[in-house]
């Protein structure tokens, strides 16, 4: 039995805590809302982020990070990307032994454009790190909470570490594959949020299935193009953390990025969208980070650039569609050398 603390009591952190508890592990979860932690301990529900789901009674919730981390050998980080450094800086003052650091957040750090595993390795002293592992894939928290069949990927530089995390989570409804490509797995999970925002805009504008299919396909090309430039394996983007996550995030009403894009497509301002969502929309920050990376690394990402102009330069969504459709004609196969 592994002693594991889930850091972050949002919908995804709560759902993953359920998986771990179902597997018989000693599971604690930390959140900064004391009233929510009290509810999880007494009513076994997270009514704010995962309403209507009864949590295993063995999950113990803490509002004190120090108490939550006593004697643990594994932590699972599921917090917004912008909060990582603050949380990690607090954790490194508490942890005293090398432990496994798993993260299940899909985003790129604002300001630095770093992957989350890079942030962990920068902030946590080497003597406190046993392994850093990424857990990612097509996985809505609402469905995992209902114990519906879900498949994800565990990625680490050391394959034994990825397999250990695979064993932690795997059960009859939660299947886990392994992948040594930590760069590709992280980037696929983060960058698909950009395309999900654009897919929501497409649906909000009522552009139809043809346009959405083209957007998703060309969007995957952009993801793989940047991913390869950053050291990812192109084949990773055809797997669960690339195409798989892209499909589920671009087509489901559970996707907050799709919902945000849908509102933008229907004429709402970004400020109105973010205020109404009530939860983090990682795709907004990731669009900015990816656009900056693309310019720095000289990678062509026209969909990302068009969305960046909508979100941060006030461009009209219909004009953005027109600019993409009016680009210089090209051979589709021109993308292939970037992928192989």
Swiss-Prot record:
<feature type="binding site">
    <location>
        <position position="106"/>
    </location>
    <ligand>
        <name>NADPH</name>
    </ligand>
</feature>
<feature type="binding site">
    <location>
        <position position="192"/>
    </location>
    <ligand>
        <name>sn-glycerol 3-phosphate</name>
    </ligand>
</feature>
<keyword id="KW-0521">NADP</keyword>
<dbReference type="GO" id="GO:0047952">
    <property type="term" value="F:glycerol-3-phosphate dehydrogenase [NAD(P)+] activity"/>
</dbReference>
<dbReference type="InterPro" id="IPR006109">
    <property type="entry name" value="G3P_DH_NAD-dep_C"/>
</dbReference>
<feature type="binding site">
    <location>
        <position position="245"/>
    </location>
    <ligand>
        <name>sn-glycerol 3-phosphate</name>
    </ligand>
</feature>
<keyword id="KW-0520">NAD</keyword>
<dbReference type="GO" id="GO:0006650">
    <property type="term" value="P:glycerophospholipid metabolic process"/>
</dbReference>
<dbReference type="GO" id="GO:0005829">
    <property type="term" value="C:cytosol"/>
</dbReference>
<dbReference type="GO" id="GO:0008654">
    <property type="term" value="P:phospholipid biosynthetic process"/>
</dbReference>
<keyword id="KW-0443">Lipid metabolism</keyword>
<keyword id="KW-1208">Phospholipid metabolism</keyword>
<keyword id="KW-0594">Phospholipid biosynthesis</keyword>
<dbReference type="InterPro" id="IPR006168">
    <property type="entry name" value="G3P_DH_NAD-dep"/>
</dbReference>
<dbReference type="InterPro" id="IPR036291">
    <property type="entry name" value="NAD(P)-bd_dom_sf"/>
</dbReference>
<feature type="binding site">
    <location>
        <position position="139"/>
    </location>
    <ligand>
        <name>sn-glycerol 3-phosphate</name>
    </ligand>
</feature>
<feature type="active site" description="Proton acceptor">
    <location>
        <position position="192"/>
    </location>
</feature>
<dbReference type="Pfam" id="PF01210">
    <property type="entry name" value="NAD_Gly3P_dh_N"/>
</dbReference>
<feature type="binding site">
    <location>
        <position position="257"/>
    </location>
    <ligand>
        <name>sn-glycerol 3-phosphate</name>
    </ligand>
</feature>
<comment type="function">
    <text>Catalyzes the reduction of the glycolytic intermediate dihydroxyacetone phosphate (DHAP) to sn-glycerol 3-phosphate (G3P), the key precursor for phospholipid synthesis.</text>
</comment>
<dbReference type="InterPro" id="IPR011128">
    <property type="entry name" value="G3P_DH_NAD-dep_N"/>
</dbReference>
<feature type="binding site">
    <location>
        <position position="141"/>
    </location>
    <ligand>
        <name>NADPH</name>
    </ligand>
</feature>
<keyword id="KW-0560">Oxidoreductase</keyword>
<feature type="binding site">
    <location>
        <position position="255"/>
    </location>
    <ligand>
        <name>sn-glycerol 3-phosphate</name>
    </ligand>
</feature>
<dbReference type="Pfam" id="PF07479">
    <property type="entry name" value="NAD_Gly3P_dh_C"/>
</dbReference>
<feature type="binding site">
    <location>
        <position position="33"/>
    </location>
    <ligand>
        <name>NADPH</name>
    </ligand>
</feature>
<keyword id="KW-0963">Cytoplasm</keyword>
<feature type="binding site">
    <location>
        <position position="12"/>
    </location>
    <ligand>
        <name>NADPH</name>
    </ligand>
</feature>
<comment type="pathway">
    <text>Membrane lipid metabolism; glycerophospholipid metabolism.</text>
</comment>
<feature type="binding site">
    <location>
        <position position="256"/>
    </location>
    <ligand>
        <name>NADPH</name>
    </ligand>
</feature>
<feature type="binding site">
    <location>
        <position position="11"/>
    </location>
    <ligand>
        <name>NADPH</name>
    </ligand>
</feature>
<feature type="binding site">
    <location>
        <position position="137"/>
    </location>
    <ligand>
        <name>sn-glycerol 3-phosphate</name>
    </ligand>
</feature>
<dbReference type="GO" id="GO:0046168">
    <property type="term" value="P:glycerol-3-phosphate catabolic process"/>
</dbReference>
<comment type="similarity">
    <text>Belongs to the NAD-dependent glycerol-3-phosphate dehydrogenase family.</text>
</comment>
<feature type="binding site">
    <location>
        <position position="282"/>
    </location>
    <ligand>
        <name>NADPH</name>
    </ligand>
</feature>
<dbReference type="InterPro" id="IPR008927">
    <property type="entry name" value="6-PGluconate_DH-like_C_sf"/>
</dbReference>
<keyword id="KW-0444">Lipid biosynthesis</keyword>
<dbReference type="GO" id="GO:0005975">
    <property type="term" value="P:carbohydrate metabolic process"/>
</dbReference>
<dbReference type="InterPro" id="IPR013328">
    <property type="entry name" value="6PGD_dom2"/>
</dbReference>
<dbReference type="GO" id="GO:0046167">
    <property type="term" value="P:glycerol-3-phosphate biosynthetic process"/>
</dbReference>
<dbReference type="GO" id="GO:0051287">
    <property type="term" value="F:NAD binding"/>
</dbReference>
<protein>
    <recommendedName>
        <fullName>Glycerol-3-phosphate dehydrogenase [NAD(P)+]</fullName>
        <ecNumber>1.1.1.94</ecNumber>
    </recommendedName>
</protein>
């Amino acid at each position: 039995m592994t002693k594991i603390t889930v850091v972050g009591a949002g919908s995804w952190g709560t759902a993953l805590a359920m998986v771990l508890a179902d597997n018989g592990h000693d599971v604690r979860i930390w959140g900064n809302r004391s009233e929510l932690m009290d509810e999880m301990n007494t009513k076994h529900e997270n009514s704010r982020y995962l309403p209507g789901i009864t949590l295993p009674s063995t999950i113990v919730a803490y509002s004190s990070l120090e108490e939550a981390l006593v004697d643990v050998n594994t932590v699972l980080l599921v917090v917004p990307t912008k909060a990582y450094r603050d949380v990690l800086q607090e954790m490194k003052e508490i942890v005293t032994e090398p432990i496994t650091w798993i993260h299940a957040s899909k985003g790129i750090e604002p300001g630095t454009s770093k992957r989350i595993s890079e942030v962990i390795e920068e902030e946590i002293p080497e003597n406190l790190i046993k392994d850093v592992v990424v857990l990612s894939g097509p996985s809505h928290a609402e469905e995992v909470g209902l114990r519906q069949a879900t498949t994800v990927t565990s990625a680490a530089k050391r394959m034994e570490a990825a397999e250990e995390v695979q064993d932690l989570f795997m059960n009859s409804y939660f299947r886990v594959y392994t992948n040594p490509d930590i760069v590709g797995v992280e980037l696929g999970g983060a960058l698909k949020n950009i395309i999900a925002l654009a897919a929501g805009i497409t649906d909000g504008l009522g552009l139809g299935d043809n346009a959405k299919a083209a957007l998703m396909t060309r969007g995957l090309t952009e993801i793989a193009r940047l991913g390869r430039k950053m050291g990812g394996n192109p084949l990773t983007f055809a797997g669960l953390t690339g195409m798989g996550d892209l499909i589920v995030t671009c087509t489901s009403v559970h996707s907050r990025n799709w919902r945000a894009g849908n509102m933008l497509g229907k004429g709402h301002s970004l400020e109105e969208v973010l205020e109404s969502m009530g939860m983090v929309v990682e795709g907004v920050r990731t669009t900015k980070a990816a656009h900056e990376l693309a310019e720095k690394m000289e990678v062509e990402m026209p969909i990302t650039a068009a969305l960046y102009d909508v979100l941060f330069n006030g461009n009209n969504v219909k004009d953005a569609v027109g600019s993409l459709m009016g680009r210089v004609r090209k051979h589709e196969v021109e993308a292939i050398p970037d992928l192989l």
